[in-house]
């Protein structure tokens, strides 16, 4: 990654696709009427180094919070009750599942078309992918990872594709530590993940 071991004064968010802003709460975005500041000493969502202090509500070790599928109009969850709706499946997942089935049946054009419906829908408006074969499957894996982020699919997808033992061994969690307007790409917890 171009971020590994580097720092920058330029926020990295502008170069990311629209689904990032719909999925993640990050420094400078608005959440529940507040501009979030996920930096060291930040006022709304402050950064906290891993195990530097005991858990503190409203702090982050990655520089990010989850936004996807949350309703900003609802009050914060207290205890074990919430009025937040549970989303079990979305139409985008149905299209991606069908695209993968088409790929497995060597129906390349149908697979491309289905994935591109997800990429080209209103609010996302990304250009279509025209790859085929193994290149298409790599594009598809990335598309699924982004589109279905934090919906509970990736771990099981990786197992189903028999790639978990490759991708998840010696894997590390990364994030951004923002100090005085400088963005630093960091290891969040300094631990290599091991997959059995």
Language-model segments: residues:
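Acidic/polar-rich alpha-helix caps and helix-coil junctions
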Residues: 1-196
């Amino acid at each position: 990654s171009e971020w590994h071991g580097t720092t920058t004064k330029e926020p990295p968010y502008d170069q990311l696709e629209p689904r990032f802003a719909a999925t993640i709460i990050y420094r400078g975005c608005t959440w529940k009427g507040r501009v979030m500041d996920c930096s060291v000493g930040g006022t709304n969502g402050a950064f906290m180094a891993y195990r530097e202090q005991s858990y503190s509500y409203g702090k982050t070790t990655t520089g990010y919070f989850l936004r996807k599928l949350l309703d900003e109009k609802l009050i914060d969850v207290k205890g074990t009750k919430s009025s937040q709706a549970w989303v079990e499946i979305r139409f985008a997942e149905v299209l991606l599942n069908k695209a993968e089935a088409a790929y497995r049946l060597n129906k390349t054009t149908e697979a491309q078309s289905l994935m591109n419906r997800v990429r080209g829908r209103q609010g996302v408006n990304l250009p279509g992918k025209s790859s085929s074969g193994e290149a298409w499957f790599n594009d598809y894996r990335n598309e699924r990872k982004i589109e279905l982020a934090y919906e509970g699919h990736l771990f099981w997808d990786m197992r189903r594709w028999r790639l978990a033992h490759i991708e998840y061994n010696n894997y590390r969690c990364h994030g951004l530590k923002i100090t005085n307007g400088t963005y630093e790409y960091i290891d969040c917890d300094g631990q290599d993940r091991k997959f059995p």
